[in-house]
Design a protein with these regions (language model features):
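Active-site loop-to-helix "anion-binding N-cap" substructures in soluble metabolic enzymes
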Residues: 1-136
Length: 136
């Protein structure tokens, strides 16, 4: 898919850190992705942003973990990051905290956004936190 004529191409991503929220809530069994169709459909956008932006931060959720604010391994996005690494042929590290998104890496995936308190409460709350981390 060529994104040259898409709305994305109207933005100047050069030297900008971009935050991309994707729906990678996909079936996983025994730490293996069973269906990567959603990931494959997102690849053109991800590749475009990797090419144009300074860096890319990806957030997604997986399942409905308890609202304890604690990591629950059965809802981790690590298998998703592993599969995305294979699809992109580059490492996709996981950030276990918002501070981890500030690492100097081309691409980082945040651990399951639903592990973070406030995720379900108000979009504005999270948007404010991410505003300081990413420009777009």
């Amino acid at each position: 898919m060529d994104l040259t004529n898409s709305k994305l191409s109207s933005f100047n991503f050069k030297e900008k850190r971009v935050l991309l929220r994707v729906d990678f809530n996909i079936p996983i069994r025994d730490e293996e992705v069973l269906n990567d169709e959603r990931m494959i459909r997102a690849l053109p956008t991800i590749k475009y942003l990797l090419e144009k932006a300074k860096s890319l931060r990806i957030i997604t959720h997986r399942g409905r973990p308890l609202e304890s604010g604690e990591v629950q391994p059965e809802f981790s996005v690590k298998p998703i990051a592993k599969r995305l690494s294979q699809l992109l042929d580059i490492p996709v590290p996981i950030a276990d905290s918002l501070d981890g998104l500030e690492q100097d890496k081309k691409i980082i995936m945040l651990e399951n956004i639903r592990f973070f308190q406030g995720e379900k409460e108000k979009v504005k709350y999270k948007a404010t936190q991410f505003n300081t981390l990413c420009v777009v």
